[in-house]
Amino acid sequence: MKHADPLRADTLGTAPLSQAIEAHHHGKEREAHRQSLSSVPGDTVVEAPEKVVDLEINSVDNDKEHHRAPTRDEIQTLRKVPGSIPATAYLLCFVDFAERASWFGARSVSSNFMQFPLPEGGNGAGAPPSGSELPAGALGHGQRFSVALGLVFSFLSYVIPIFGAWLAEAKVGRYRTILIGVLIGGVAHIIMIAGAVPSILQAGKGTAPFLVSLFLLALGAGLFRPNVSPTVLDQHRHYQPFVKELPSGENVIIDPEATMQRIMLIFYALINVGAFYSLATVYSEKLVGYWLAFLLPGIIYLLLPLMLWYLNDKLIKVPPDGGALTKFWKILTVSLVENKGMVWKKGFFDRVQPGALLQKYPSSGPVKWTSKDVEDVKRTLVACEIFLYFPIYHLNDGGVGTILPSQGAAMLKKGVPNDLLGNFNPITIMITVPVLTYIVYPALRKSNIKFGRISRITLGFWLAVISGLVSSLVQWRIYKTSPCGYHATTCPEVAPVSIWWQLPSYVLGALSECFSNVTGYELAYARSPPGMRSLVVSLFLFSTALSSALGLILTPAIVDPHLVWVWAGPTIALAVQTVIFWVRHRKYNDDEFMIEGDE
């Protein structure tokens, strides 16, 4: 489906609102866009009225008849608050919660499942003897295999989203792609549960079904992940700041960027509520065995088809628009040709502006894009450039592959599963998100203190640097105190270092995600054309795949006695990169947060 002529760039809250005011008065373009949407046959935008859930007294309903653009004086003096969030957006967040709960629940126990053999004296289902310091296990392929396969799984889970985004944007639409992904993921969970039956593990035949289930789980997640967050944000259809009088009599500016930020914080918090579900699976592997540890994720996964069936006729569904992808690649290709491949050339996109092309090629006919389309390409590429800084960041957020729970296996546990502390990552996020949403960010807006998107990402990077430094010091201490010295990983005795010393690494990593990852999702949606949002989100997710690829390169070094540098190397690299990132990109703290206008 092709939309009408591209709209003028809109802005969101912390962008220069004077430009947004000008855009607010271009009603004819917005009306033309609405007519183009209403004329699309088939699975198009749902116009049915929606219930709106309002969780904050400072959030208000976006009643169209009260829309008024703020004046310049109001921009300087009025408080900026988020708008109301449709109920469908919250329900989609719960859909994502169920998918992430099943995904993290299975993934959290996969490290021990792959690395360690069935414990001696255990129950034959993978659980160790009661009171033992032995970790749960099943396949016994060792640490290097476990880390490498974990990285391959992560790599596939974040590469396949590019295909999932293309399928959604160009062929079947986001919602139908989500349904296909859910079906494949369901098959994966069935195979995973069947392969963890004690008789299969005891016969040494658990590897093949586990590998098949991992691949299918990655495929299903790859179709689901890039499309769910854009679909959540599609439910919010107001992209222009406007003035609203609260019941108290106070006039405020309803800030679309603040609304979008709140939606993504809630979305990310529910992802991590789902991740907290792994607490049940790690205790299941330790106390009962892997058949239960994999059954629990499968049970919660059943919520997905039920909730999607309920939401089917209530959602705003954006139809596929292959024309947007085609136009993007045409503009980029012509830019490369016109600049002879010199991507560093100043004014790289000036030569493909419609006026410049018509002047250079007057007999070639009308140009099939507008200046707005060229600007969209520029802004999308800036977002993609920012995403290139995330792979090294991800290496520091929890370490390379499954190295953090492997480190915990060499520490004093006193009955605590070595992969239990991973649950403090989602716990920290669950606590931090409400604090940021309802206390910190409103206080900053009320005090007119700008905490821009680049500042938030930079803070997240620095928190990850500190997290990596802590893990480096913990690993050094393990080597110094282990009975086997610098061969602590394979030592039959653990180092007299409490596993709780890993807690700062998990907490700092979680705090960093609240700033870096959440802002990354915002940028992916807001800086991309409407017909490319899933694709740009998939490119943000692809940064995790690049991180996994870097981890695979480091895999040969993930052995004693080199583990200190496996932690310290990425930490140093991220510290240097963060300085470069801030210097190069801080100017984007104040630029337009441009997205489609549809009011």
UniProtKB/Swiss-Prot annotation:
SS bond partners: none
Keywords for this protein: Glycoprotein, Membrane, Transmembrane, Transmembrane helix, Transport
One Pfam short name: PTR2
Record flagged with keyword Glycoprotein: yes
Annotated Basic and acidic residues bias: 23-34
Protein's cellular compartments: Membrane
Major localisation: membrane
Top-rank taxon, per record: Eukaryota
InterPro entries documented for this protein: MFS_trans_sf, POT_fam
SUPFAM superfamilies documented for this protein: MFS general substrate transporter
Coiled coil (UniProt feature): none
GO cellular component: membrane
GO function terms (MF aspect): transmembrane transporter activity
Annotated region described as Disordered, given as residue ranges: 23-42
Glycosylation sites: N517
Membrane-related topology note: Multi-pass membrane protein
Sequence intervals crossing the membrane: 147-167, 178-198, 204-224, 263-283, 291-311, 386-406, 424-444, 454-474, 539-559, 563-583
Family: Belongs to the major facilitator superfamily. Proton-dependent oligopeptide transporter (POT/PTR) (TC 2.A.17) family.
Function: MFS-type transporter; part of the gene cluster that mediates the biosynthesis of UCS1025A, a member of the pyrrolizidinone family that acts as a strong telomerase inhibitor and displays potent antibacterial and antitumor properties. These compounds share a hemiaminal-containing pyrrolizidinone core fused with a gamma-lactone, giving a furopyrrolizidine that is connected to a decalin fragment.
PANTHER family (UniProt xref): OLIGOPEPTIDE TRANSPORTER-RELATED
Protein name, entry field: MFS-type transporter ucsM
